[in-house]
């Protein structure tokens, strides 16, 4: 193989870890955090729809087999059973893929769980473009679907460090929670910034004098990587991490965007989700309601069904890789 030839990607790259080569990772942070939490609290039960291994719930099943319920490929039944358990005083942690929760089980989450404001925690793997298996498995519109559901809190953690903190934080939050789950070997990013998850809060991770990126989920990792590369090019970009999409931390968003507007800085939202109905639109609506009008741009997935293929290729193609972000932001800043 010559220096100019790229390594040929195989089908395993369709489900590859989002971690960059050599990046520190932590295996199954959700599963390990839930096992530890269940050791302290007898009310916690785990339910899944034939996906325990692929949502890291198998660790809970091994540790507490009498508190684990395998519901089979029946997501609607899964949510109904969780609702019933919550009504009896249990705290169910439910796992499946994000596409199945948002598309197939929506009505059951809405009527059985959210309307009753039950204490059910729904953790869903393969959010956004974290699989190359095509539209049947890519939950690129899950936030848009769930944002309009009353009582439902939506969380999009960045990395293993944050997931480990979100799990114990949400168990005491009264009401249903939908968490976008990164599983397997999950990158460690925010520990380098002494970050601590604060439920309901967005936090500035890095300051910048030319632009600020407001991001969630894995895009905060990408935003920080892009900021480091842009700094080498003389462009100073700040990063604000907003893990809770709903209810949005409007106070922090307005403060950061307001300061950017006064200073003439660009505000950029970055999300692993369709450009329609996600974090970017939520922030844009907040700014409009309050009369804050900075220069504003979005980095997001297009409003279309996406292709199948190797994840690194797809992330480049759809503009959410670090290199694609760097090129786009540099163009915006210099134009």
Protein language model annotation of sequence segments:
Residues 1-180, 185-186, 196, ...:
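Thiamine diphosphate
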């Amino acid at each position: 193989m010559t220096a100019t030839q790229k390594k040929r990607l195989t089908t395993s790259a369709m489900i590859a870890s989002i971690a960059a080569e050599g990046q520190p990772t932590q295996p199954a942070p959700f599963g390990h955090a839930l096992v530890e939490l269940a050791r302290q609290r007898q009310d916690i039960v785990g339910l899944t729809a034939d996906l325990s291994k692929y949502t890291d719930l198998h660790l809970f099943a091994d540790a507490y087999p009498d508190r684990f319920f395998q519901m089979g490929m029946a997501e609607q039944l899964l949510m109904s059973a969780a609702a019933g358990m919550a009504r009896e005083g249990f705290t169910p942690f439910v796992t499946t893929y994000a596409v199945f929760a948002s598309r197939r089980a929506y009505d059951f989450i809405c009527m059985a769980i959210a309307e009753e404001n039950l204490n059910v925690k729904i953790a869903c793997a393969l959010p956004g473009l974290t699989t190359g298996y095509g539209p049947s498995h890519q939950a690129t519109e899950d936030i848009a679907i769930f944002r309009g559901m009353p009582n439902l809190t939506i969380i999009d953690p960045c990395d293993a460090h944050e997931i480990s903190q979100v799990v114990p934080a949400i168990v005491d939050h009264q009401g249903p929670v939908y968490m976008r789950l990164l599983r397997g070997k999950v990158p460690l990013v925010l520990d380098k910034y002494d970050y601590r998850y604060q439920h309901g809060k967005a936090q500035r991770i890095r300051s910048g004098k030319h632009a600020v990126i407001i991001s969630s989920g894995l895009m905060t990792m990408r935003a920080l990587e892009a900021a480091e590369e842009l700094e080498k090019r003389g462009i100073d970009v700040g990063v604000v991490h907003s893990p809770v999409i709903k209810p949005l931390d409007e106070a922090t968003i307005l403060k950061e965007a307001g300061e950017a507007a006064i200073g003439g800085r660009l505000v950029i939202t970055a999300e692993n989700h369709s450009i329609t109905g996600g974090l970017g639109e939520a922030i844009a609506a907040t700014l409009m309601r309050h009369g804050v009008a900075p220069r504003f741009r979005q980095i997001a997935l297009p409003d279309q069904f996406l292709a199948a293929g190797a994840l690194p290729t797809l992330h480049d193609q759809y503009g959410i890789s670090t290199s694609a972000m760097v090129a786009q932001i540099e163009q915006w800043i210099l134009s």
